[in-house]
Amino acid sequence: MSNINNYALKQNTILYGKSHTYTIEKILGQGSFGITYLAMTQVKVSGALGELETTIQVAIKEFFMKDINGREENTVTCGSRGGVYYDYKKKFSREAENLSKLNHPHIVKVLEYFEANNTVYYAMEYVDGGNLDTYITQQKGLTEAESIMYAKQIGDALSYMHAHKMLHLDLKPGNIMLRKNQEAVLIDFGLSKQYDENGKPETSTTVGSGTPG
């Protein structure tokens, strides 16, 4: 079940979220626990002329265990391993909800999460400026000013996560995206942990990114 084209949603598939409707444009990639798509949606913005609707690109992550799941039409199937699938699906849904509550300029913004097609989706900000790893390679390193700027931005994002009882356990340049204005955005919470009120960590499933994994 590893061939992404056999099991991914097709171009122009419509997904109905809680607040938005999404049209699948293309596949961005696939990891062990999900398929990430580029999609279009309408959002309302306020300006001098009042409230207007505009079309934006978003990334949508679909919970899909490539070693377990299949697909009939758009519906995700799980065969005889439904127990395993539904356990992980429940975790994925809870963690998507937690991520949707985060609001920080240097953490990828989750618009909403929702259930459809026997699985869970969440829509997030699409950051298309490339990742920090690629930027470092292209520039043959960072300047001192850039190093200080990115360290501060990501440090602020991590402090915000910690204040919300979340840990990011896969911090690396490949999981830091750059907006077109060169601001850093922390993505890929696949190895994050959520702490409960008693301070006990619960290991996550693979969730929360604008990248395939």
What do these predicted regions represent?
Residues 117-131, 135:
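Conserved short submotifs of the Hanks-type protein kinase catalytic core
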Residues 113:
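Activation-segment/catalytic-loop signature of the eukaryotic protein kinase fold
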Residues 156-166:
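Protein kinase catalytic-loop region centered on the HRD/HxD motif
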Residues 203-213:
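Conserved activation segment of eukaryotic-like protein kinases, specifically the C-terminal portion
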Residues 150-151:
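Activation segment signature within eukaryotic-like protein kinase domains
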Residues 74-101:
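AlphaC helix of the eukaryotic protein kinase fold
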Residues 25-31, 36:
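Protein kinase glycine-rich loop
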